[in-house]
């Protein structure tokens, strides 16, 4: 009989340290669970160039796809412009006083809008709704039958006229429209975004001369400033959110509902400041040596050796910047014995920061939401024992590891639900973060940031004794793997079968 948070399998000879039952997942974390199955959403980006709009758009789609199971897509007007006029459009192409170029850019926006509508309403009944000749009664018809569809209309959309056109295009359709404006007055952030455009923007990647590309971008920006109109009370009938200076201030207007509220929370935590995440599994545990899954066993001597190596690495590389000087850094782990023991040698010196007070370096934050996937009645068993005792369960898991749930245990989808709030917090951090975790949990966090579909996460490699460094960027994610201790196939450190 289960008591409190203890495992339903009581301690016994084969499983002396069972894993505790993990915290309950948030059942409302997935689209379609609590929301209207026919709801669709459009998020319209607003703002000057170099304000992080495309970064926000891509991150938003990634978040909704991975954590909420939504079919979400970015419709970038710049892509359609490059298809029409090429990627060498001169700065004066964006001159608001040039009627011909204004018309061309509007045509690009119309093409993006048309494709977004097709994506959102791709069944025949909905296609009739978006037909230009459909009568107004049909515009008030029932919502579509497809759940979790999100379109992100990514462009400057920086005039009231353009936003009125977007509103008119979507008026009467069964879709919620929310405008998202990014405002930044921080010159250092703007300058960094301009310089990043040389390496990440498809408009400038081919330009060999960096200063020439930056000058061209600045001239383009000047043209946009001439016509820029921020969201204001004149558009109070619209639903919108303003993010000012990387989330320092948030202004919300007519935002209602579960998903819009969730998105506002996500956007409020997001910023474009570059930082790195470091992921590592715990050191070798006693159950690793015995080939058992789950449990809550302690480290072996080899595991403690890795913990010492990790502490040295953290001090030299995570807690110091490129110049070798101390920098603020964070540390998370699960609540399980093996991760807490892996963190035990990491130092926590105090940093006196001008204007910020005292910072405790690598202050250890422990989260049960980072605990390993719970194997239920199979906790503490080897895979051979599971296959022998529960052959049908073993076969089901092999067919679909993402959705398979152990009897009285968890699935990868359950872990996704409990990781959602932690990723929200990770997005808000400006400092490097080290997470000491477990294979299944780190597979999911890694997959999210590295850009893998969640269906592929259960097969990704997260080896022992290895640090994975990820540095997310607008169009990519840089990855580096550092092996701190060689894995000896003969001493119990062999990679166990996949959890």
Predicted regions and their residues:
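NTP-dependent small-molecule kinase module
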Residues: 4, 12, 29-33, 169-172, ...
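Hydrophobic anchor at the beta1->P-loop junction of P-loop NTPases
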Residues: 45, 153, 435
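A glycine- and Lys/Arg-enriched "phosphate-lid" helix/loop adjacent to the NTP-binding pocket
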Residues: 91-101, 132-136, 170-230
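Phosphate-binding P-loop
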Residues: 33-39, 143-146, 426-428
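The conserved Walker
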Residues: 49
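Conserved substrate/cofactor phosphate-moiety recognition/catalytic segment
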Residues: 54-121, 133-137, 141, 146, ...
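Extreme N-terminal, non-catalytic leader segments
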Residues: 1-42, 66-70, 271-272
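Phosphate-coordination/substrate-recognition cap region in phosphate-metabolizing enzymes
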Residues: 155, 163-164, 169, 176-200, ...
């Amino acid at each position: 009989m289960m008591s409190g948070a203890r495992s339903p399998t009581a301690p016994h000879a084969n499983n002396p340290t069972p894993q505790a039952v993990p915290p309950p997942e948030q059942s409302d974390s997935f689209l379609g669970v609590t929301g209207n199955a026919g709801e669709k959403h459009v998020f319209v980006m607003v703002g000057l160039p170099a304000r992080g709009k495309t970064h926000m758009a891509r991150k938003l789609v990634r978040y909704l796809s991975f954590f909420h199971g939504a079919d979400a897509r970015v419709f970038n007007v710049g892509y359609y412009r490059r298809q029409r006029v090429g990627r060498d459009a001169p700065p004066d192409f964006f001159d608001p006083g040039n009627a011909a170029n204004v018309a061309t850019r509007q045509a690009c926006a119309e093409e993006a809008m048309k494709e977004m509508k097709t994506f959102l309403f791709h069944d025949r009944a909905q296609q009739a709704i978006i037909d230009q000749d459909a009568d107004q009664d049909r515009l008030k018809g029932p919502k579509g039958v497809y759940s979790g569809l999100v379109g992100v209309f990514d462009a400057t959309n920086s005039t009231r006229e353009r936003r009125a056109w977007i509103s008119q295009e979507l008026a009467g359709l069964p879709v919620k429209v929310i405008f998202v404006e990014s405002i930044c007055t921080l010159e250092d952030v703007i300058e960094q975004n301009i310089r990043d455009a040389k390496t990440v923007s498809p408009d400038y990647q081919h330009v060999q001369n960096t200063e020439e590309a930056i000058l061209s971008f600045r001239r383009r920006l000047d043209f946009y400033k001439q016509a820029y109109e921020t969201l204001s009370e004149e558009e109070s009938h619209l639903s919108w959110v303003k993010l000012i200076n990387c989330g320092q201030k948030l202004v919300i207007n007519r935002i209602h509902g579960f998903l819009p509220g969730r998105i506002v929370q996500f956007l409020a935590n997001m910023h474009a400041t570059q930082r790195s995440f470091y992921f590592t599994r715990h050191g070798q545990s006693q159950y690793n040596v015995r080939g058992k899954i789950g449990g809550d066993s302690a480290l072996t001597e080899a595991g403690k050796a890795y913990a010492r190596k990790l502490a040295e690495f953290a001090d030299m590389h995570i807690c110091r910047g490129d110049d070798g000087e101390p920098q603020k850094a964070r540390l998370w782990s699960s609540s399980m014995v093996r991760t807490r023991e892996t963190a035990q040698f990491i130092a926590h010196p105090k940093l006196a920061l001008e204007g910020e007070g005292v910072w405790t370096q690598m202050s250890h934050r422990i989260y049960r939401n980072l605990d390993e996937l719970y194997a239920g009645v199979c906790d503490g068993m080897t895979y051979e024992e599971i296959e022998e005792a529960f052959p049908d369960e073993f076969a089901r898991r092999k067919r679909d590891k993402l959705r398979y749930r152990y009897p009285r245990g968890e699935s990868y989808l359950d872990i996704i639900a409990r990781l959602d709030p932690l990723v929200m917090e990770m997005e808000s951090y400006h400092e490097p973060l080290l997470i000491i975790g477990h294979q299944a949990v780190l597979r999911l966090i890694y997959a999210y940031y590295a850009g893998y579909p969640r269906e592929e996460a259960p097969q990704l490699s997260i080896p022992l004794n290895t640090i994975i460094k990820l540095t997310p960027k607008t169009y990519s994610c840089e990855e580096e793997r550092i092996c701190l201790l060689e894995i000896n196939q003969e001493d119990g450190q062999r990679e166990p079968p996949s959890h």
